Amino acid sequence: MALIKVKPTSAGRRAVVKVVTPGLHKGKPLAALLEPKKRGSGRNNNGHITVRHKGGGHKQHYRVVDFRRNKDGIPAKVERIEYDPNRSAHLALLCYADGERRYIIAPRGIAVGAQLVNGVEAPIKAGNCLPLRSIPVGSTVHCVEMMPGKGAQIARSAGTSVQLLAREGSYAQLRLRSGEIRKVHVDCRATLGECGNEEHSLRSIGKAGASRWRGIRPTVRGVVMNPVDHPHGGGEGRTAAGRHPVSPWGTPTKGYRTRSNKRTSNMIVRRRHAR
């Protein structure tokens, strides 16, 4: 992987920094693993905005990714590494010995031709998927399940990983990149190694239009709006909000806890904000 700074042929190109991955597949994705992707533009079933700053963007197909990795004992060969517009990580196309093909999140350092396998008896090697009970303590893993058989939910973005700290009875303790330590059942599966495309965070898209291509709309400050649009709006000239920062719907935005599901709190050993 390499970072390339683009020649400043225009104001929009001046700040562009690209991440170039040699060996990335240049053809089309596998049609059998594509699904149509409808854009919600941040609206709910009533057409009301529930997530701001979303809308537009280039039309995309969704790549069906195998997050369960439940095809045990059958070796698979990495056919190619592909770009995925729906996520920051790259995808690896696996061809199993029985002929089935599946996409997975490409681990760091994986190459075309590598042999991978899933299951309890899989060797300890980057890219192989095993239950947490079979992974050595201290290992770095990614694509971790939170419930057995549900599919990976933790550490799926580019460059992310989780460390297996300990195993106590039916649960394993994981340290997340945020600093949070949480318990996960030992039957949950995880993939050894880190997610690939680790230099993704070093790129610079360079201009506002590149955000619009990605379906991201502008973020407008509340203090420059009218009172009908935002609690911070109104006033003559440049004025402060006049209150503690809130969302357009009046919810405090700094330090206010909005998490309501208390049933899963017992799985969190150490919170990410703990000192």
Curated annotation (Swiss-Prot):
The molecular function GO annotations come to: rRNA binding; structural constituent of ribosome; transferase activity
Record key words, sorted: Ribonucleoprotein, Ribosomal protein, RNA-binding, rRNA-binding
GO cellular component annotations, sorted alphabetically? large ribosomal subunit
Q: Where is this region: Disordered?
A: 36-55, 223-275
Which Gene3D superfamilies does the UniProt entry name for this protein? 2.30.30.30, Nucleic acid-binding proteins (2.40.50.140), Ribosomal protein L2, domain 3 (4.10.950.10)
Q: Which InterPro entries match?
A: NA-bd_OB-fold (IPR012340), Rib_uL2_dom2 (IPR014722), Ribosomal_uL2 (IPR002171), Ribosomal_uL2_bac/org-type (IPR005880), Ribosomal_uL2_C (IPR022669), Ribosomal_uL2_CS (IPR022671), Ribosomal_uL2_dom3 (IPR014726), Ribosomal_uL2_RNA-bd_dom (IPR022666)
| GO BP annotations, alphabetical order | cytoplasmic translation
User: What is the superkingdom listed in this entry's lineage?
Assistant: Bacteria
What function does the entry list? One of the primary rRNA binding proteins. Required for association of the 30S and 50S subunits to form the 70S ribosome, for tRNA binding and peptide bond formation. It has been suggested to have peptidyltransferase activity; this is somewhat controversial. Makes several contacts with the 16S rRNA in the 70S ribosome.
> Self-association or partners: how does it assemble?
Part of the 50S ribosomal subunit. Forms a bridge to the 30S subunit in the 70S ribosome.
Give the record's family classification. Answer: Belongs to the universal ribosomal protein uL2 family.
> Could you identify this protein by its name?
Large ribosomal subunit protein uL2
Per the UniProt record, the source organism is Thiobacillus denitrificans (strain ATCC 25259 / T1)
Q: What is this protein's gene name?
A: rplB
